[in-house]
Design a protein with these regions (language model features):
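Hydrophobic alpha-helical connector segments
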Residues: 52, 66-94, 119, 137-147
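Amphipathic C-terminal alpha-helical segment
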Residues: 128, 148-166, 181-185
Length: 185
């Protein structure tokens, strides 16, 4: 394995173990066993390195989508939505990084392609489900973006404790079920 890949692997491990704020170039270099200047020989800066890590997160999320059961379109979409929330809850630091435009370079070609692939796959799943919204003639990519935003918000609120402390004490599964019922009818 080359130094560039080792730096990405090490940054991913630090991210998972210690969170976004702990992932510094110097800390990555130390944990990877390379000189403190090595990251800048392989990346233009922290944003480029973190973009490579976030790209890996999108690839992992896409891999989950490719493993969806071969069932009805509605069941596949429901499984994809559960997979998204499960990914967020199982990988909170990666989930945070993937959407932190202050830490990553959203114009990075690999990151942009990976994020687009995840959304495009999701949009295809949404378009395949005959819902009242779809029958109304709504732009299905906009519907997909709206459902994604709802899923993302649900996951983020759960991670931040915004729903966990609610007086009615929902579980992620029950909140997701209500969200899906609202979108899918």
């Amino acid at each position: 394995m080359g130094t560039r890949q080792r730096l990405i692997d090490t940054a991913s491990e630090l991210l998972a173990g210690e969170g976004v704020d702990a992932v510094t170039l110097r800390g990555i270099a130390k944990a990877a066993g390379v000189s403190h200047g090595a990251p800048l020989r392989h990346f233009s800066g922290r944003a480029e390195l973190l973009s490579a890590v976030a790209t890996r997160g999108y690839a992992d999320l896409l891999a989950r989508r490719e493993k969806l059961p071969d069932t009805s379109p509605r069941e596949r979409l429901t499984a994809a939505c559960h997979s998204y929330v499960d990914f967020a809850l199982a990988n909170p630091a990666m989930f945070e990084l993937m959407f932190r435009r202050d830490l990553i370079d959203a114009t990075d070609p690999a990151l942009s392609a990976a994020a687009s692939a995840v959304f495009d796959t999701f949009a295809v799943l949404v378009a395949a489900v005959p819902t009242p919204i779809a029958r109304s003639g709504a732009d299905l990519r906009l519907v997909a973006a709206s459902l994604w935003a709802a899923l993302h918000g649900l996951a983020q609120l759960w991670l931040w404790g915004g729903l966990a402390g609610a007086s009615f004490a929902p579980s992620p599964e029950s909140a997701l079920a209500v969200t899906l019922d609202a979108y899918l009818g």
